[in-house]
UniProtKB/Swiss-Prot annotation:
The keyword tRNA-binding applies. Residues 240-539 are annotated as: Catalytic. GO terms for biological process: threonyl-tRNA aminoacylation. Belongs to the class-II aminoacyl-tRNA synthetase family. This is Threonine--tRNA ligase. The gene is thrS. HAMAP family: Thr_tRNA_synth (MF_00184). It comes from Flavobacterium psychrophilum (strain ATCC 49511 / DSM 21280 / CIP 103535 / JIP02/86). Binds 1 zinc ion per subunit. It is found in: Cytoplasm.
Amino acid sequence: MIKITLPDGSIKEFENGVTPMDVAKSISEGLARNVISAAFNNITVEISTELTTDGSLVLYTWNDKDGKKAFWHSTSHVMAQVLEEMYPGLKLTLGPAIDNGFYYDVDFGDTKIVEADFKKIESRILEISKEKHEFKLRPVTKADALELYKDNEYKFELISNLEDGTITFCDHATFTDLCRGGHIPNTGIIKAVKIMSIAGAYWRGDEKNKQLTRVYGTSFPKQKDLTDYLELLEEAKRRDHRKLGKELELFAFSQKVGQGLPLWLPKGAALRDRLEQFLKKAQKKGGYEQVVTPHIGQKELYVTSGHYAKYGADSFQPISTPTEGEEFLLKPMNCPHHCEIYNVRPWSYKDLPKRYAEFGTVYRYEQSGELHGLTRVRGFTQDDAHIFCTPDQLDEEFKKVIDLVLYVFGSLGFENFTAQISLRDKENRDKYIGSDENWEKAENAIINAARDKNLNTVVEYGEAAFYGPKLDFMVKDALGRSWQLGTIQVDYNLPERFELTYKGSDDQLHRPVMIHRAPFGSMERFIAILLEHTAGNFPLWLMPEQAIILCLSDKYEIYAKKVLNLLENHEIRALIDNRNESIGRKIRDAEMQKTPFMLIVGEEEEKNNTISIRRHGQEGKGNITVTIEEFARIVNDEISKTLKTFEV
């Protein structure tokens, strides 16, 4: 008999050779009908795999992330089979599951895949699916594997780097592929498929290697799931931050300035400034001190911090001074600079914690093919802060940072999120620096803080940084997509590298603990996500322009200026549209700019010292006429519902 531990902690005994499917049947028939994959002792296995030792078992359905991963990986095998049939002579390379689907990188040789072929590929995949071919994993010797793929230099290279005894093939129908495993039971579960696109991709991601063709696809267990997904993609196109950024005149890019270097236009700069002032105000209440550091630093600074060794390939080339022979780097991180600020003077335990905050611009070299709007850029500004505290202060400081992150999310309409607690892999302690005692303190601080703040959490072992555990906030946007926003990290590494100290109550020198935190992450990426989440309808307090005054004709321009002055006295951001256009055109343009309030002024309004309000997106609901003071109350009441005061 063997003992199987289930996710709820219960332990069941089974005959040696039991399969995950057998375990599912012992739990419920419903689970047995829906289980498609499993993990045994944290290793993905098929549900037909015979289990011969004690261990922990997790069963996955389509609703689980790992279930989808197995589903999409299996579909990539079927697509590879079809591509091999349709394009004789091609060479398959790698075909993993990715977010929302899968891809396969292919060397098509002298042939070429075109979009017109997609429907044929989809139809053939579904034909094979209906035949319900089982996915079967089998071990092979390295010699046999190399023999099979002697004419495919890509698979040959992969196999050459594997150890004998670890190589497996996956068979279904007449198709065989090199694979480690993680498949659904059979092709019959695949009911809907869509080939999404093709793109160029270098072998193993190295631009020095041959460029292959990457074929992207997705699949689902129901046709309705695919239909819903495609509708979601259409909505995502409408919300694309690159499209909205151009339409709303927020930011632009210039080839002369350089790829991945956004230019913030007046309205976009105003939006950024509002976000910065919002966070600075909260940080001031939270005891943070603003600092400013240069855009460059000596290479030696980043060698000391370890960033150059780890991220040197992602940094721009060093800048050498003409005469002194010094080497500088465009700043890839703010934290080394903040360590040097801490080191300017000696500290006592009575002085701690020290909280340094900065909107610091950093630079990373991203390959041109990886750049994407504001989400992947080469220059970006982080809302960085670093807290230097004693080990005894760690718990309380961590909770305070969580409070700040929750305040930011609540003020900006991000209500659906999960906190991922990333801990070390205790089986591989050599991967991490610092004592077991410090690690346990830090991990417990994060776990306890998340519990005390009633966060919805998931725990990921082995996902901690080498220098300390962390808490990542995974936010779902209006389209149900998950984004990592807001990170809090505990760091024992940099205080050691920079020899940071404070004098304790025992008059001895001690190392402080360092906390990295960035609620936004980067201003560029955060604004991109916020744009797509809100479709450009930002919270009223954040809008660059909260109202626009529309004159029925130019003879009401003097009154419009009077209205503008009164609005400014109430700290309402507005402007006047006095163009020689029809009122209908002015309204349409204001709607396109997503201006929250259109204030129409004409003869009646001037006579009665009023304005006629039209709300964005409420066509056909009629206008209401109010005084300026009444309108100011409407605006302030709406803002007060979303923008609360940060309570320490």
